[in-house]
């Protein structure tokens, strides 16, 4: 039986450190090494910061549900929110080859999530809001 780790927090930026600690515990307990754990922490931090900033538009009364689970040789993180709908197809790809002086500030969160994780999937339904599922393969 897979071990599940669950955390529910309100949508305040101050919760990001609590989320990072939760992810570290769940990832290390599931067999991820230090580098893999760091990748997951960074991806989840980006995702949750985006939920707070964009889905809830900075409102502190939103809810973020995070579930982590080891499934075979994969570590699966699901992040659920009930904020404004997110459509990743509407996010322009960052121009990472442009000089820094010509780049916009921000806009790299989705790019980083996809680089750090092995799978990234977004879903939305009117009844259950936004659901982000990210997978990291567990390597020894």
Locations of the language-model features?
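Conserved beta-strand-loop-beta-strand hairpin that lines the nucleotide-binding pocket
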Residues: 1-6, 52-140
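Helix-loop-beta hinge of the Bergerat
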Residues: 3-34
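Conserved catalytic core of two-component sensor histidine kinases
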Residues: 17, 37, 41, 114
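Short hydrophobic/aromatic-rich motifs at helix boundaries and adjacent loops
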Residues: 20-26, 37-38, 81-83, 92
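Conserved short strand/loop->alpha-helix "switch" segment adjacent to the catalytic nucleotide/phosphoryl-transfer site
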Residues: 23-45, 102-104
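Hydrophobic residues in the alpha-helical elements that line and stabilize the ATP-binding pocket
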Residues: 47, 51
């Amino acid at each position: 039986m897979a071990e599940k780790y669950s955390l529910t927090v309100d949508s305040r930026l101050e919760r990001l450190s609590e989320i990072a600690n939760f992810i570290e515990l769940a990832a290390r307990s599931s067999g991820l090494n230090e580098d893999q754990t760091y990748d997951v922490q960074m991806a989840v931090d980006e995702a949750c910061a985006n939920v707070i900033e964009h889905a809830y538009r900075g409102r502190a009364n939103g809810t973020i549900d995070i579930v982590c689970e080891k499934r075979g040789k994969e570590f699966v993180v699901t992040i659920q929110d009930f904020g404004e709908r997110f459509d990743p197809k509407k996010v322009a790809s960052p121009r990472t080859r442009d000089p820094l002086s010509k780049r916009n500030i921000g806009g790299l969160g989705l790019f980083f999530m996809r680089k750090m994780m092995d799978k990234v999937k977004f879903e939305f339904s009117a009844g259950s809001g936004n659901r982000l599922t990210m997978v990291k393969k567990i390597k020894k």
